[in-house]
Amino acid sequence: MDLSRSQTNFQLGFGCSHASMTPTPTPRAPIADDSINLQVDQSFRSLPTTFSPIPLQLLEQKAEKTTTVDEPKKDGGGGGDQKEDEHFRILGHHMCLKRQRDCPLLLTQSKHPKRSSIGDSDLESRRAAVRAWGDQPIHLADPDIHELMEKEKQRQVRGIELIASENFVCRAVMEALGSHLTNKYSEGMPGARYYTGNQYIDQIENLCIERALTAFGLESDKWGVNVQPYSCTSANFAVYTGLLLPGERIMGLDSPSGGHMSHGYCTPGGKKISAASIFFESFPYKVNPQTGYIDYDKLEDKALDYRPKILICGGSSYPRDWDFARVRQIADKCGAVLMCDMAHISGLVATKECSNPFDHCDIVTSTTHKGLRGPRGGIIFYRRGPKIRKQGHHSSHCDTSTHYDLEEKINFAVFPSLQGGPHNNHIAALAIALKQVATPEYKAYIQQMKKNAQALAAALLRRKCRLVTGGTDNHLLLWDLTPMGLTGKVYEKVCEMCHITLNKTAIFGDNGTISPGGVRIGTPAMTTRGCIESDFETMADFLIKAAQITSALQREHGKSHKEFVKSLCTNKDIAELRNRVEAFALQYEMPASLIRIE
């Protein structure tokens, strides 16, 4: 290449004037002040040349490859070296590149013209691999978990479920729980989310709220509801957090008397068990040890002395109806907000099969499973609108407002104070369950559940068993085992080996001491499977037989709990009773054939 002409034909100039760089001024079009310009000498076009001027192009677009092969030497000394040169033109000059350009992309494209299709194939392969990773059924994705799930399925099918807080959900609820709604994050309340894309989630939650009010016969201008709590314990703590400062007072039914731990339970030794008792000051009221009923007179005396800011009614192991009107009077006298935890009786409340806490309470909380047959979760109802001042009300906590201010406080406590995003699959499942609560079929179910509990209580009483309060008004009963010399701990273990599930519970003894001397028995789950009064008569026989086996084993092994448990696996009486229980249970289908009997 002749480089002698390049300095006259091709020059670089700057927007600023530099006379030394351009001996012969030539016209050029300025681009911008103080910017670099490409300056071409006008005389270039008139110079004779064998090449026609061509526009500047990318090297790979105009590269012309020529191959020169050295002739083999006549002495036969091996093959000639193959050399590959590249020739191209730029600004009319013929140029030859002797050294191979380091351009892997260019060489790859020239040697592999179908590279793009190969790349697309690789991308599709990677996409398919990712999709396949998340598209396996449980038995392939995780055989270990699948095996355990199958075992739990068989346990439910082949056993008698008498735990009062358990039930079997319907098919539609199960489908919603396992749906795509679990994918969406939706922190906040409907219409005020922290994430976008929640227009349909908002509609689902609003529909759930509407159905919750309808299920319990409530007017939206008088009651509001939050359906986001993860559990009733979470719902209860949200109420405390929203309405109280740390260290302020709450008062609920003592746990051994039938209350729930989330109502502020402390052990007799003073150990704080519940977060409610850790962050707030709690003081319990109790049942009458002779009758097992709540002593409302003593409750009033204690409340007037203690002056709680929140008075809690409701429990988890109380078999009798509540006098909500009397508790309302007590709350008014001591100036407390009245809250009811109706977790165990919510189905009875919805169908008007027990006294109604909404007639008297300011706040009502509940689980969403148990009698409601919904998903596991919590719910909070709260009053809104103008307050109705009752005669004899004492405002000891400086409450002079004329309207309820519970809504904003409770909603803020649920989110962002205590929870993050709600479980949208749970809210949809709850909406389905609440729709069913408003049907005549559900009312018939609750009525049968209550009849079954009374039939079971009567059957045990005829067999000389002692029941706390002598019976039941709802879905559960408490069997005091102490007259038989048994504790709930050993008895529930024998029942479990016989495929009967129930739970031990503390009994408030006649002498004022607390011992886990009883068991709690409930009828919701087996009523769901189709059992009626006569079936619970049969179950009473199973329970009595299990108690007899427990007494015999306890006499044989004395106080050695280790030997007692060891003997359960080889006991012939247990094996015989287990076979009878399984044969009985297999007669009844699980709801909507969710779990097939095999």
From Swiss-Prot:
Q: What S-S linkages are listed for this chain?
A: none
What's the superkingdom here? Eukaryota
Give the enzyme class. transferase
Please provide the Gene Ontology terms (biological process) for this protein: glycine biosynthetic process from serine; response to cadmium ion; S-adenosylmethionine metabolic process; sulfate ion homeostasis; tetrahydrofolate interconversion
Instruction: Spell out which residues are annotated as carrying N6-(pyridoxal phosphate)lysine.
Output: K370
Keyword Transferase assigned: yes
Q: Where in the cell is it found?
A: Cytoplasm
* Its biological purpose: Catalyzes the interconversion of serine and glycine.
- The segment annotated Disordered runs over 57-85
Q: What is this protein called?
A: Serine hydroxymethyltransferase 7
Q: Which GO terms describe its molecular function?
A: glycine hydroxymethyltransferase activity; pyridoxal phosphate binding
Q: Which Gene3D superfamilies match?
A: Aspartate Aminotransferase, domain 1, Type I PLP-dependent aspartate aminotransferase-like (Major domain)
- Which keywords label this protein? Cytoplasm, One-carbon metabolism, Pyridoxal phosphate, Transferase
Subunit = Homotetramer.
Q: Which cofactor does it need?
A: pyridoxal 5'-phosphate
Family named by the database record = Belongs to the SHMT family.
Whose protein is this, by species? Arabidopsis thaliana (Mouse-ear cress)
Q: Which GO CC annotations does the UniProt entry carry? A: cytoplasm; nucleus
